[in-house]
């Protein structure tokens, strides 16, 4: 099975942006989210990773805009950002996206997350935003600002609750073009049977091939953002490289 690539469209105040290490205020603008998403679709993407960063940081919402973008696409969409309760979850699923990503809520509200997983199954992925703190992998919430506890304890709980897919981001790598954290991905795959989607740090085709080498361990896909926008490689080049 070949690695699935998910080009990212991160949205702030109606514009497609990229952050550096997930920090508000570090945005670089790239224009219309609709144009960005359609460009990835035209380049051969099977998935688009669409993120409402205003909702993720708790400072607003681009939900109507993103619902419109999803309606204009024929490819599958993974929708993320600010999905924290029944109303926001149902609104997200009603856009027609193929699946949603839960982030902060999976850390802060385990009971609600467990109910959501039981009800919607593999339409839900859980985003695990991770930072190495004093030699220990810790999860992060609220737009990567708050500590969410030990990664391995969090994973064990989510596995028990029936999570089938994790989107794993090393926050120290995201938006930096410094290469993915292959060790972290491998360690996560070793302790869960769920699918793993890698996020953060991809800067070269070689990085994607390195992630591709973990497919047999359980890595299903990779989210690619800044490297594409910065022109490090094109999506068709990346798709060709990992399809081998």
Swiss-Prot record:
Keyword field: Amino-acid biosynthesis, Cytoplasm, Histidine biosynthesis, Isomerase
InterPro entries membership: Aldolase_TIM, His_biosynth, HisA/PriA_Actinobacteria, Isoase_HisA-like, Isoase_HisA-like_bact, RibuloseP-bd_barrel
Catalytic activity, reaction form: 1-(5-phospho-beta-D-ribosyl)-5-[(5-phospho-beta-D-ribosylamino)methylideneamino]imidazole-4-carboxamide = 5-[(5-phospho-1-deoxy-D-ribulos-1-ylimino)methylamino]-1-(5-phospho-beta-D-ribosyl)imidazole-4-carboxamide
Associated pathway: Amino-acid biosynthesis; L-histidine biosynthesis; L-histidine from 5-phospho-alpha-D-ribose 1-diphosphate: step 4/9
Annotated EC: 5.3.1.16
Domain of life: Bacteria
Active site: 10 (proton acceptor), 129 (proton donor)
BP GO terms, sorted: L-histidine biosynthetic process; L-tryptophan biosynthetic process
Signal peptide feature range: none
CDD domains according to UniProt: HisA
GO molecular function, one term: phosphoribosylanthranilate isomerase activity
Catalytic EC class: isomerase
Gene3D superfamilies assigned: Aldolase class I
Entry annotated with the keyword Isomerase: yes
Family the UniProt entry places it in: Belongs to the HisA/HisF family.
Entries under HAMAP family matching the protein: HisA
Protein name: 1-(5-phosphoribosyl)-5-[(5-phosphoribosylamino)methylideneamino] imidazole-4-carboxamide isomerase
Name of the coding gene: hisA
């Amino acid at each position: 099975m070949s690695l699935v690539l998910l080009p990212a469209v991160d949205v702030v105040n109606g514009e497609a942006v990229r952050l550096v290490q997930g920090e508000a205020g570090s945005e670089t603008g790239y224009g219309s989210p609709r144009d960005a998403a359609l460009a990835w679709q035209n380049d051969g993407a099977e998935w688009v990773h669409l993120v409402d960063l205003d909702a993720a940081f708790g400072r607003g919402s681009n939900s109507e805009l993103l619902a419109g973008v999803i309606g204009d696409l024929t490819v599958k969409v993974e929708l993320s950002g600010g999905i924290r309760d029944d109303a926001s979850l149902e609104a997200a699923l009603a856009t027609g996206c193929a699946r949603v990503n839960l982030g902060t809520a999976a850390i802060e509200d385990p009971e609600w997350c467990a109910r959501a997983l039981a009800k919607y199954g593999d339409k839900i992925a859980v985003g695990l935003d991770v930072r190495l703190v004093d030699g220990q992998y810790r999860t992060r919430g609220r737009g990567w600002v708050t500590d969410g506890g030990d990664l391995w304890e969090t994973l064990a709980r989510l596995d028990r609750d029936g999570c089938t897919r994790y989107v794993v981001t090393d926050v120290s790598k995201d938006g930096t073009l410094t290469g993915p954290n292959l060790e972290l991905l491998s360690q996560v795959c070793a302790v869960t049977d769920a699918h793993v989607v890698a996020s953060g740090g991809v800067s070269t085709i070689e990085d994607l091939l390195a992630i591709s080498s973990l497919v047999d361990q359980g890595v299903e896909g990779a989210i690619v953002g800044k490297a594409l926008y910065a022109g490090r490689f094109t999506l068709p080049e990346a798709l060709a490289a990992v399809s081998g």
